[in-house]
Structure formats: C-alpha cells, structure tokens
C-alpha cells in the first residue's frame, strides 16, 4: 500500500493539493501498463481537457501477441510525444498541474518501468505531487467519472490480462470475490482468434483477436458447437478459461482434418466456432457473476437502493457479453453500468480520474522526492474468495439468450 507524505514533506505543495480555491485542480494521468501509451489531463469534475493515446495493436497483431521487449521499446519511443500532446490539447502548462498520476501496478514489468521512470523525472523537474495508481482500481472506478455512483457496488473486470469479481467499498477498499485461476477471458479469445488465423480474414485484418471473434460471431450459429462451460461443479466465483480453450482447439483440429484445411486457411464453420466460443465465455462470466451477486446480497454487502454491477476492462467492449450479463442483472434486480468502449480499454483518462478520486480524499499522494517502485503483480483488495467458496451458493439456471 502506498503511504501518504508526512506533514513536513507536504508543506511545500499542500496548499495546491488540498486547496479550497474555486479554481479546479488538474491531474495528468499516464498509462503504460501493457501495450497502450496513454496520457490525459482532467479537472476534478471529470472534464477531459486533453488526451492522447498511442496503440501498439497493429504491431502486436503482426507478431501474434504482445512481446514485452517490443512493448517497452514502443512505450519509450512514444511516451514523451503522447504526454506533450495531452498537455497541448488541454492548453495546460506543467506548472498548472496539481499532481501527476501514473499506473505502477499491475502489468508488464518492462512497460510499467517506462511510465514510472518518465513520470518520476517529470514530477521532480516540475516539483509536482505524485499519485501511484493501481491499474485495476482505475478500471473499476472509471464509471464514476461518467455517472453519479455511490459505494458500494459490484465490479466485473475482464481484459486480456485479468478476469476478476470484486466489491468496491471505497476508492482504495475492495473485497476480492473471484479471479481467474489460469488465463484471462480476453487472452482466451485472442488465442482462439490466432488459432483460427483470423488475422488473415478479410473482415478482421485490423481487429484484435477478441474484436475479430465478436465480428464473425454475429453471423455464426452458437448452437453449431457445444462447449462445456468451465467449473460447473465449483460453487465459487473464480474463473478458468484454459480448459475451455483446449475444448475449442480440439474442435478446430477435428474440423481441419475433416475439411482438409491447412494452416492459415479458414474453416467453413469459422463463424459458428466464433459464436459458440464467445457464448461459452460469456456464459462462464455470467454464471460466476450471478453467484457473486447472490453472495453479496446474502451478506448485506450491496445497498437496497440501486444496487449496481460495473463491467469494465477491454472485454467489456463486447456487446454480446454485455447483453448476457444484462440477463443476470435483470433477474437479480441490479443496474448494469459499462463505460463507453473507448474507456474500457487502457487509456490515460482512467488513470487521471483515479488520481482525481485520490486527490479529493487525500489518499496515496506522494512528494515528488519519494522513491516509488512498480509491481508487475498486485492483488486487488482483500481476498475473500475462500469465504465465497464456503458459502457454496447454487445458482439458478437462466436462459442466456440474446436477440443478436
């Protein structure tokens, strides 16, 4: 946990950080946890004054996945430009900033290091407070920038690197209800897309793996293949996608032999496999989320008025998965909120907003002279997954069908 500065260290800049002046405080957010170099300037109302984002997606599509050394090099080449663009678009000088917020955990070590090194040099040069940010906390709280939402609320975070369920009780207080035991949902969808050679598909050349699956699934028959939803007899909220990917890979291998398809060619049923894969991933996410809702209700952890499920992270951009989750929230009386797709994927805006949240409450604000380290692995909140498992809540069956 990050320690706030001692009063003596705060003296030189506390007036600006904790000022009651009517002039809005401004935070520069910097994101480099994986393969997006992002920066944004926000005021304390959540107004985006300027932002910039450099995506490495096209490079990593060509290499078949994220190579940490390549990601590091691209962050190094682009971070100065991206930050300067965000400042220029906001018409804000560094001297006008109240603080700088940067992702320091979790993520790829080499990527985190670029963002942290740049940020520490920046805050020392301009003598600005530094706010270290937990990447998953930022995803969880992004929706509060767009909607008036009080704590507590349930959060499902699904991306290429993470799949977890947590109860958000405060800006830095979370209860971890479930997490992936192997690979994340987004990683699974990306690997299935690579196995299907969707990079070469005429409809999918510029899309990420998950986006390609979603695109083709719209014209596929999800009932053409039956994949077993993982962990059906495990009454907890953890996720597991590796076994599902093995099932799907087996089906692809079988069909390739039947059709005589060689590597790089497409199966005639590629859209059906995409649809069935997407549905099974969505179903697994939905069932674990359903149990998390029932657990939270049984323990009185959700408010009676306007209980809410937030879905964020890159996979939350998938409209089909959102629709399946809406079936669960409708059945359990929860309100479903998802950030716009542009804020589901990694960006500087969510980091700046998390900095604003911390600034308002005076939490985790460090002096520019303090030493900070990045953490490639970092849990989210207090782990109560064993308590969830002990509750052994059985989830009633629901028909997970959509109109699309």
Swiss-Prot record:
This is tRNA N6-adenosine threonylcarbamoyltransferase, mitochondrial. The gene is osgepl1. Pfam families: TsaD. It comes from Danio rerio. Keywords: Acyltransferase, Metal-binding, Mitochondrion, Transferase, Transit peptide, tRNA processing. GO terms for cellular component: mitochondrion. Binds 1 divalent metal cation per subunit. Its EC number is 2.3.1.234. InterPro entries: ATPase_NBD, Gcp-like_dom, KAE1/TsaD, TsaD. It is found in: Mitochondrion. Monomer.
């Amino acid at each position: 946990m990050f320690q706030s500065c001692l009063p003596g260290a705060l003296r030189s800049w506390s007036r600006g950080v904790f000022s009651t002046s009517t002039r809005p405080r401004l935070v520069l957010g910097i994101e480099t946890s994986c393969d997006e170099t992002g920066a944004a300037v926000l005021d304390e109302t959540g107004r985006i004054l300027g932002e910039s984002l450099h995506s490495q997606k096209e490079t990593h599509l060509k290499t078949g996945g994220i190579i940490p050394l390549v990601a590091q090099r691209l962050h190094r080449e682009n971070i100065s430009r991206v930050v300067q663009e965000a400042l220029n678009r906001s018409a804000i000088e560094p001297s006008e900033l109240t603080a700088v917020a940067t992702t320091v955990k979790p993520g790829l070590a080499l990527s985190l290091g670029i963002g942290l090194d740049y940020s520490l040099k920046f805050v020392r040069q301009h003598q600005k407070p530094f706010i270290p940010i937990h990447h998953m906390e930022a995803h969880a709280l992004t929706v509060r920038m767009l909607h008036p939402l009080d704590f507590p609320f349930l959060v499902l975070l699904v991306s290429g690197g993470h799949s977890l369920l947590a109860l958000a009780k405060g800006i830095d207080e979370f209860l971890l209800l479930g997490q992936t035991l192997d690979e994340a949902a987004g990683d699974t969808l990306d690997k299935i897309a690579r196995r299907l050679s969707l990079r070469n598909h005429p409809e999918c050349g510029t899309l990420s793996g998950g986006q390609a699956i979603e695109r083709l699934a719209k014209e596929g028959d999800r009932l053409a293949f039956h994949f077993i939803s993982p962990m059906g007899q495990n009454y907890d909220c953890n996720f597991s996608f590796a076994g599902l990917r093995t099932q799907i890979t087996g089906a692809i291998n079988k069909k390739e032999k039947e059709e005589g398809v060689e590597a790089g060619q497409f199966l005639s049923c590629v859209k059906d496999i995409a649809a069935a894969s997407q549905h099974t991933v969505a179903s697994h996410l939905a069932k674990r989320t359903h149990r998390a809702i029932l657990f939270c209700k049984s323990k009185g952890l959700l408010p009676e008025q306007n209980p809410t499920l937030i879905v964020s992270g890159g996979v939350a951009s998938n409209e089909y998965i959102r629709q399946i989750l809406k079936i669960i929230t409708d059945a359990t009386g929860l309100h479903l909120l998802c950030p716009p797709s542009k804020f589901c994927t990694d960006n500087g805006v969510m980091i700046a907003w998390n900095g604003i949240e911390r600034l308002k409450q005076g939490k985790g604000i460090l002096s520019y002279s303090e030493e900070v380290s990045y953490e490639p692995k970092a849990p989210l909140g207090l782990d109560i997954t064993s308590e969830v498992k002990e509750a052994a809540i059985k989830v009633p069956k629901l028909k997970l069908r959509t109109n699309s």
